[in-house]
A protein has these predicted regions:
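Nucleotide-activated donor-binding/catalytic signature segment of Leloir-type glycosyltransferases, i.e.
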Residues: 256-278
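A short helix/loop element that forms part of the nucleotide-sugar donor recognition site in Leloir-type
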Residues: 49-57, 191-205, 258-259
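Conserved acidic donor-binding segment of nucleotide-sugar-dependent glycosyltransferases
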Residues: 334-342, 350-356
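Short hydrophobic beta-strand element within catalytic cores of glycosyltransferases
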Residues: 315-319
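Glycosyltransferase donor-sugar binding loop
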Residues: 43-44, 186, 215, 242-258, ...
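Aromatic "clamp/platform" in nucleotide-sugar-dependent glycosyltransferases that forms part
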Residues: 298
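Donor nucleotide-sugar binding/catalytic pocket of nucleotide-sugar-dependent glycosyltransferases
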Residues: 39, 145-196, 205-207, 274
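Conserved donor-binding/catalytic core segment of Leloir-type glycosyltransferases
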Residues: 4, 186, 200, 205-222, ...
Length: 392
């Protein structure tokens, strides 16, 4: 089986939902699927230099290949005429395409090319069909859907959702297309010798202070307006902890600056470390150091950062708008609550006051994630879905 993965960018600056295509491709390759990723060299939306990669020819890694094409960005909208020309010429060599992202010109155009070339394709929305997400730039998206994405959804072989909740709430624009509900996978972080201690020493975090970690994009939907006041209240009530804010937002630097200023003008400032974007050994070390992971998002179609924390053995405190909240609750992998400040005061406080329970829920989280969020298990589910589509 030969499969194309099409995505606007796989740069690390776009976070887990884009990076997951790398894990998926590797998992599929291990199951003897021939995989080609086609993408652009986009590397951020605020004037960053493009990725330093070879363009227009295959780069082989981990059993699959990636072909990068020059991106012609307009603000955060990505387009590549070279990618589309390549797709039109080579679509006939593949059995199926898996297209990631809606409301992105390069993905939308790729869907039309696939349809014209009679290549079956699956669309993964990445949360863009969530009503909360559709409210952003509402009029533009309504027009875009009416003239472009509605037809793309109708012509798709299936829509790939990553949770039952995402499938349940997503807008379909009147289209009836088959759903695939298959979660994302995570790769367990490599152990860094004394990584947790080194991180604490590097940033002057007391060894006896529980480390509360937020590791995600600094975005308005992530609920930092709930988390920061909740942590302030916990400080007022004499709870001992150190907060680490790990993330950035190349698409909205003004909001990132606002959050940093809010913390700088708060009692939290002497109990907080702001790291910026982290990856590699530093990210793995932070996950080793963390005692609790928090994500009070207003909406999250899956929550890849939560799954990464779970597979690292960290108990999680999340909102019931992170769409894997039921798995977290049922597996006793952490605490789940409503998007309210007082709820997070209560849940984080309960976790901090019960270190043994915290540790047990971390073990539960790791066990669950290794079983259900491993790329090998997910790749097999996706291959079965591909085969079902191709035999219809």
């Amino acid at each position: 089986m030969k499969v194309l993965q099409v995505i606007p960018s796989i740069s690390v600056v776009y976070g887990g939902p884009s990076q997951m295509v790398i894990g998926l491709a590797s998992g599929l390759a291990q199951e003897n699927v021939e995989v080609t990723i086609i993408t652009t060299d986009s590397n951020g939306d605020s004037g960053q230099k493009p990725l330093d990669v070879t363009l227009n020819c295959p780069v082989k890694q981990n059993g699959y290949e990636i072909i990068y094409f020059r991106c012609a960005p307009f603000r955060r909208y990505k387009f590549s005429l070279d990618l589309l020309k390549w797709l039109k010429a080579h679509a006939c060599e593949y059995d199926l395409a898996h297209i990631h992202a809606l409301f992105s010109p390069v993905s939308s155009a790729a869907a039309r090319v696939c349809h014209q070339q009679k290549l079956p394709y699956i669309l993964r929305p990445l949360g863009t069909l969530d009503p909360a997400d559709l409210r952003k730039k509402k009029q533009l998206k309504r027009l875009y859907a009416a003239f472009i994405e509605r037809r793309n959804l109708a012509d798709a072989a299936a829509i790939h959702f990553t949770s039952e909740q995402e499938a349940k709430i997503s807008e379909r624009f009147g289209v009836v297309t088959q759903d695939l509900v298959i979660p994302l996978g995570v790769i367990p972080p490599e152990k860094v010798e004394n990584g947790g201690s080194l991180v604490r020493s590097q940033w002057g975090i007391p060894q006896d202070s529980p480390l509360v970690l937020f590791m995600s994009r600094i975005d308005q939907k992530k609920g930092l307006d709930l988390l920061i006041p909740a942590l302030e209240k916990l400080l007022e009530s004499q709870h001992n902890f150190h907060f680490v804010l790990a993330g950035t937002n190349s698409q909205d630097p003004d909001y990132e600056r606002k959050i940093k200023e809010q913390i700088a003008n708060s009692a939290l400032r002497s109990h907080t470390t702001i790291t910026g974007f982290v990856s590699g050994e530093l990210k793995a070390s932070l996950l080793q150091a963390a005692d609790l992971f928090v994500l009070p998002s207003y909406y999250e179609n899956f929550g890849i950062a939560v799954a990464e924390a779970m597979v690292a053995g960290i108990p999680v405190v999340i909102s019931d708008q992170v769409h894997i909240w039921q798995q977290v609750r049922d597996s006793k992998s952490g605490w789940v609550g409503a998007t309210e400040v007082e709820t997070f005061v209560k849940l984080i406080g309960e976790a901090l006051q019960n270190p043994q329970e915290c540790q047990q829920r971390g073990l539960n989280a790791q066990k669950y994630a290794l079983e259900y969020f491993s790329w090998s298990a997910i790749a097999r589910q996706i291959i079965q879905a591909y085969q079902d589509i191709l035999t219809k």
